[in-house]
């Protein structure tokens, strides 16, 4: 054998020589993707598709609700107060039994919320330091359908509303102390007042009118007490019949029912006089008008007649004919 031939035993092969014994690089085996990775991809696709469907469903439901909801309606109008044109708006919320009136803008804005469910009216003036409430009759605001919306628009929009301001009659004056417990107020009235102190309003008449009202009461009481004894004496005549049918006598003899302000008598409809007195609607009117009321602060200290209040501001609202309201409440129109 040749001396130069080197034979190395396999047992003597070092670790550096093992790489020569391995398979070539192109002979590596391909590994298949694992199952959890595939499931993650499928889950992500399903999740994104579901989110997109929910988004489109929410958008469709919102537009469907917005188009079919007829419980809230807004109308804007123009009124003339002391020769100055001012914009106003009325919002009817039949679902919550509320009416909201806004008059003026900026520092002259006045907001009135009528809560017919609880029989409370809330009034707030821009820049004021107080919020006012007063009691009112309870009623039910009709739902505002398409026909009613057209009727309100034709009645109010595009016209200058006449103003009825009782300068020498009724004045609302705030009491001296604020309300301590406001739990009886609705959420809408509390939202209107915010953090301002809330004061009750009490009706106040000038001294001359108070004396006239007392004189009328003195003259009316003897007449009503002697009426049962005057029947057999004969026919009282047309003049006596007219006096007996005056609304003032009906107000004294019939209690006011806030749950049924409309009474059916035969084929005609009669209205409770307090609906007109409280400014809910107008019994004798054939068209709507703007009713303004004076909200004043009490004059502290010595109160010389007739200056027992100060700092008066006006809050105005639209008053519709009672026949217009009852037609919609009873579903006649």
From Swiss-Prot:
Residues linked to a glycan: 243
Transmembrane region(s): 42-62
Single GO cellular component term: extracellular region
Presence of the UniProt keyword Signal in the record: no
Gene3D superfamilies the UniProt entry points to: 3.30.390.150
Cysteine pairings via disulfide bonds: 131-193, 281-285, 282-322, 292-316, 296-312
Chain residues in the propeptide: 211-214
Domain of life: Eukaryota
Region of interest: Disordered: 212-269
Family: Belongs to the chondromodulin-1 family.
Protein name: Leukocyte cell-derived chemotaxin 1
Source organism per UniProt: Oryctolagus cuniculus (Rabbit)
């Amino acid at each position: 054998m040749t001396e130069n031939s080197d034979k190395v035993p396999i047992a003597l092969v070092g670790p550096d020589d093992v790489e020569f014994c391995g398979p070539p690089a192109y002979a590596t085996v391909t590994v298949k993707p694992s199952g959890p990775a595939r499931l993650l991809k499928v889950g992500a696709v399903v999740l994104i598709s579901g989110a997109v469907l929910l988004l489109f469903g929410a958008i469709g439901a919102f537009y469907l609700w917005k188009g079919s909801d007829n419980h809230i309606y807004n109308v804007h109008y123009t009124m003339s107060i002391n020769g100055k044109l001012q914009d106003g708006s009325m919002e009817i919320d039949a679902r919550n039994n509320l009416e909201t009136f806004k008059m003026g803008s900026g520092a002259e804005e006045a907001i009135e919320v009528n809560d017919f469910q609880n029989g409370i009216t809330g009034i707030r003036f821009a820049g004021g330091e107080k919020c006012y409430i007063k009691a009112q009759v309870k009623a039910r605001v009709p739902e505002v359908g398409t026909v009613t919306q057209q009727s309100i628009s034709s009645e109010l929009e595009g016209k200058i509303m006449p103003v009825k301001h009782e300068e020498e009659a009724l004045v609302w004056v705030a009491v001296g102390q604020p309300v301590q417990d406001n739990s009886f107020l609705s959420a809408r009235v509390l939202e209107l007042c915010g953090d301002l102190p809330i004061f009750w309003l009490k009706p106040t008449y000038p001294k001359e009118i108070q004396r006239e009202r007392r004189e009328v009461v003195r003259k009316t009481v003897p007449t009503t007490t002697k009426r049962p004894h005057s029947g057999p004496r004969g026919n009282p005549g047309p003049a006596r019949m007219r006096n007996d049918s005056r609304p003032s006598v009906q107000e004294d003899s019939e209690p006011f029912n806030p749950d049924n302000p409309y009474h059916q008598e035969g084929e005609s409809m009669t209205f409770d006089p307090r609906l007109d007195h409280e400014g809910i609607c107008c019994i004798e009117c054939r068209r709507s008008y703007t009713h303004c009321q004076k909200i004043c602060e009490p004059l502290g200290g010595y109160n010389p007649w007739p200056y027992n209040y100060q700092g008066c501001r006006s809050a105005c609202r639209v008053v519709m004919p009672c026949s217009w309201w009852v037609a919609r409440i009873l579903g006649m129109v």
